UniProtKB/Swiss-Prot annotation:
InterPro entries noted in UniProt: Tropomyosin (IPR000533)
Domain notes: The molecule is in a coiled coil structure that is formed by 2 polypeptide chains. The sequence exhibits a prominent seven-residues periodicity.
Role noted for this protein: Tropomyosin, in association with the troponin complex, plays a central role in the calcium dependent regulation of muscle contraction.
Organism name: Pandalus borealis
Lineage of the species this protein comes from: Eukaryota, Metazoa, Ecdysozoa, Arthropoda, Crustacea
Name by which UniProt lists this protein: Tropomyosin
């Protein structure tokens, strides 16, 4: 009888231990399930972050493509502007050459006019000297008359030459006036061309600044792409680690569930054995 009681006490103790282990295993199972759920939530969050990073990367790449296209357009505009500047420089050079030739013709006409004026002054002086002389000697008078005739002839010739020179001078003055008008027109064109050059220069400076900003934006996009790529790699690594953790936790849950089933079977076996023992005792 004592042996039976001891056996019953041992079986009861084993039953209590089995129930405690079962409760412990159930608690561990709940904790493992909670950890698994948290890991799944973390994996879901990481997947969302990964998707967001991929979307950000696509946006940055699209922005970089647009920036490169804009930069190519600026390069084309810069090339066209340089061509326009070269054409303007050629036009300015031709105008400067035309102006230089006009100035040479003006200097030549001025020199000829001075020479003609000097010759006319000399003839007039000689004529006045001959007219003012009073000679009593006939030979001298004849000579003077001959000289006067010659002087008059020279004066007439001088007048004729003066008229011719005056006519040529008028032509020269007309040419000079036209040259001055052309020079003024050339100066106006030069001013306009200088203004165009200034505008083109400002445009070139603006293009250079835009190109520099585009380069800076390109570097910033590259740096941002590099950062996003690193974040993407880190997120992928974390996702892989989380997936491995979930797999490990799932294995642990499966193991605990198997152990719980075994403990329940042991508990059922002990309970059946106790019931059988009680039945046997009742038979006595």
């Amino acid at each position: 009888m004592d042996a039976i009681k001891k056996k019953m006490q041992a079986m009861k103790l084993e039953k209590d231990n089995a129930m405690d282990r079962a409760d412990t295993l159930e608690q561990q199972n709940k904790e493992a399930n909670n950890r698994a759920e948290k890991s799944e939530e973390e994996v879901f969050g990481l997947q969302k972050k990964l998707q967001q990073l991929e979307n950000d990367l696509d946006s940055v790449q699209e922005a970089l493509l647009k920036a490169n296209q804009h930069l190519e357009e600026k390069d084309k505009a810069l090339s066209n502007a340089e061509g326009e500047v070269a054409a303007l420089n050629r036009r300015i050079q031709l105008l400067e050459e035309d102006l230089e030739r006009s100035e040479e013709r003006l200097n030549t006409a001025t020199t000829k006019l001075a020479e003609a004026s000097q010759a006319a002054d000399e003839s007039e002086r000689m004529r006045k000297v001959l007219e003012n002389r009073s000679l009593s000697d006939e030979e001298r008078m004849d000579a003077l008359e001959n000289q006067l005739k010659e002087a008059r002839f020279l004066a007439e010739e001088a007048d004729r030459k003066y008229d011719e020179v005056a006519r040529k001078l008028a032509m020269v003055e007309a040419d000079l006036e036209r040259a001055e008008e052309r020079a003024e027109t050339g100066e106006s064109k030069i001013v306009e061309l200088e203004e165009e050059l200034r505008v083109v220069g400002n445009n070139l400076k603006s293009l250079e600044v835009s190109e520099e900003k585009a380069n800076q934006r390109e570097e910033a996009y590259k740096e941002q792409i590099k950062t996003l790529t690193n974040k993407l790699k880190a997120a992928e690594a974390r996702a892989e680690f989380a997936e491995r953790s979930v797999q490990k936790l799932q294995k642990e849950v499966d193991r605990l569930e198997d152990e719980l089933v075994n403990e329940k079977e042991k508990y059922k076996s002990i309970t059946d054995e106790l019931d059988q023992t009680f039945s046997e005792l009742s038979g006595y």
